[in-house]
Amino acid sequence: MQSIFNNKYQFKNIETKYNTLWDTTKLYKWKNSGTNQFVIDTPPPTISGQLHIGHVFSYCHTDFIARYQRMLGKDVFYPIGFDDNGLPTERLVEKTKKIRATDISRKEFKTICTQVSHEFRIQFKQLFQSIGISYDWDLEYHTISKDIQKISQTSFINLYNKGKLYRKLQPIFWDCIDKTAIARAEVEENELSSFMNTIAFSTEAGKAINIATTRPELMPACVAVFFNPSDIRYQDLLGQNAIVPIFGNKVKILSDDQVKIDKGTGLVMCCTFGDEMDVYWWNKHNLDTKIIISKSGTIDHLNTLQGQDVCKQLHGLSITEARALIIEILERNNLLIQKQEITHNVKCAERSGAPIEILLSHQWFIKVVDIKHELLKQVQKINWHPQSMRKQIEIWIEGLNWDWCISRQRYFGVPFPVWYSKDGKIILPDINKLPIDPTNDLPEGYQDTEIEVETDVMDTWATSSLSTQFHNISATPADLRAQSHEIIRSWAFYTILQAYYHNNDIPWKNIMISGWCLAEDKTKMSKSKGNVLTPNKLLDEYGADVVRYWTANSKLGADTTFSNEILKLGKRFTTKLWNASKFVSMFIDQYSEPDLQYITETMDKWILSKLYKVIVKATESFNSFEYCIALDCIESFFWKDFCDNYLELSKKRAYGELISKQEHLSAVNTLSFVLRELLKMLAPFMPYVTEEIYRTLYSSNNSIHSHNTWPAADVNLYNESDELLGETFIEILNQVRKVKASAQLSVKYKINKLIINKHFPVSLENDLKAVCNADCIVYDNRQNDNKEQLLVSVEFENVQIT
């Protein structure tokens, strides 16, 4: 039995052995029992590049909960999917294959995307298995598969029929790099350098007025000038016309309370469209439309009263080129009053990083703005872990003023099940015919000459937000959604929206939010910064259990800096667990069940009382998804109570030296029981080392990760008086250790006489003498001036130290 402990823990061999065993025995298979289930809505990783340590960080957090729930006896539904369509995957393909989607046929590009997605899915699966994620791989899904496309297209048609989805020509966010519309959730603000340019305008009556702008290239698209109605400087201008310099266009001067008096000159030009405020004014005041930026991000469609030569020069220029030319012309004509360098927040596309433009375009939208109040109610029905994360989504919903644009002008995605007749009628297929691809299929009763094909594809979130519908399970809402905080406004929000529209319900009872894994410089890991850590290197050096230990040392929802020091602590912890198990294995019979009826000694009952409290705390923490707190209390008990104290004080009785059989059996059964329960509590975090020890000492046929293996918080384990006596014992031991340390003596150094000011039960004297290495214990009440204070003196060869 002890042969495995003759060597150091060889994690590589152990991991290979158990990955094979768990896979072949289908240990984590969902039984679809219909009762006592725990359903997890797993985040499907996006096929957008190599997984880094940050992905391992968050995916392990979910696995802790899945393993715990399985050990509770639950039938755990824990699928894995891959979000292998959409813009992120296309960008990966273009980068890795050094091609552009526009340079080859649509069919050829989609074929290449399919091949690349398959290759990356294999890599992802290997990583997840190597880190010990306990997915049921029989539940694997791909968002580009025919089955998922059918679900997504069915959702689209149902929402359309309910009036929750529409197609309309309206302003949208446009990414000029990827040449596609994007949703508000895909827009982020980046701090960029720019110039605030103060430009000389005039009124039609000839009065000089100045307007400051960072986007002078939009002057040909100016449709109005605004001031705040409370700004007395400009109240006399209301209703007059302003003349746009260079181009000569006349635009109305209007007032609106959204103008910031203290920004720029207090006058602002409204262009179609420079930002969201322009859209707001355009709608509110029913302004004209002048779109001068093409979908490629160049200047186009210029139509001005004057400056035709300038228009010709601007035509076809990029936005930055046009801006520079306009500034040059303004300076040349003494129309540039001031040019001030600034840094400001600019809305950029999340994927490409390019500043977004707002263009008019026909797109598909899911209604959001009209039901914000209802969505906030849904959010409040869900238990958020940590609770503070709920505020993020509430702020997001409250600030929404755009519906969700779900159409993308891309290629590798779920097709819209839509055709258009020549007169613009929307044609939908029979749901029973789904999935369809309108670029290949025809609607029933139509010829190809009678229709126009919808070539756009759906936003990948429009599909992945239906993840709770991907498998036909009766348990709804799901018990848990686990995800990171940066996709609260996308994946979490969209899933809540879809569940409300389709089921009038919440998608899950609980949502557990992980933070980011930050680089050692405390910044977000990024390939461009060169601070990304690859999991395989860490797994090769430390092993899966140690890496998982590191991921568990993060507060729920908090960003955590990567730390080699915590990995080293994890390695030390694994080694100590192995060695402690080796020690216990010396005294117990292999596969024998520890018998609590043999546990009679006070210090054995003390460690059981401490164990009981740890089981209660760990169980409560896991039930509230606080895996970090669970690990902390288990680890503290292991190091301080079990290893530092109990193993030392029970050694003599475990070896059976000069004691009764009863004392020996009490120690041996306690060691066996406490170690077994410790292994069980550590199993969700460190599945490999705990499995190896458990199968070696306790059960060769049953896995520690099987159902109903979580320790029971049996109140019979706890005895308050034994706990208090034990704490006094430990206090004496700590004082003795302190005395020896201050005298620079070994902890094993013999004590001639241990003097205590309080009477101590005789039943504990043997353990106390053994652990302190004391010849005798003397009770001296004369030094007991303070009745409450415990005083300990130690005598070494007639030298007494207090």
Curated annotation (Swiss-Prot):
Residue ranges of coiled coil: none
GO molecular function, one term: valine-tRNA ligase activity
Subcellular location field: Cytoplasm
Pfam families per the UniProt record, alphabetical: Anticodon_1, tRNA-synt_1
Annotated GO biological process: valyl-tRNA aminoacylation
EC number: 6.1.1.9
The UniProt record lists the keyword ATP-binding: yes
Motif 'HIGH' region per record, residues: 45-55
Cellular-component GO terms for this entry: cytosol
Motif annotated as 'KMSKS' region, chain positions: 524-528
Keywords: Aminoacyl-tRNA synthetase, ATP-binding, Cytoplasm, Ligase, Nucleotide-binding, Protein biosynthesis
Database matches in SUPFAM superfamilies: Anticodon-binding domain of a subclass of class I aminoacyl-tRNA synthetases (SSF47323), Nucleotidylyl transferase (SSF52374), ValRS/IleRS/LeuRS editing domain (SSF50677)
Reaction catalysed by this enzyme: tRNA(Val) + L-valine + ATP = L-valyl-tRNA(Val) + AMP + diphosphate
Chain positions recorded as ATP binding sites: K527
Enzyme class: ligase
Keyword Lipoprotein tagged: no
Function field: Catalyzes the attachment of valine to tRNA(Val). As ValRS can inadvertently accommodate and process structurally similar amino acids such as threonine, to avoid such errors, it has a 'posttransfer' editing activity that hydrolyzes mischarged Thr-tRNA(Val) in a tRNA-dependent manner.
Family the entry assigns: Belongs to the class-I aminoacyl-tRNA synthetase family. ValS type 2 subfamily.
Domain comment, as recorded: ValRS has two distinct active sites: one for aminoacylation and one for editing. The misactivated threonine is translocated from the active site to the editing site.
Subunit structure: Monomer.
Name of protein: Valine--tRNA ligase
Organism: Ehrlichia canis (strain Jake)
Gene: valS
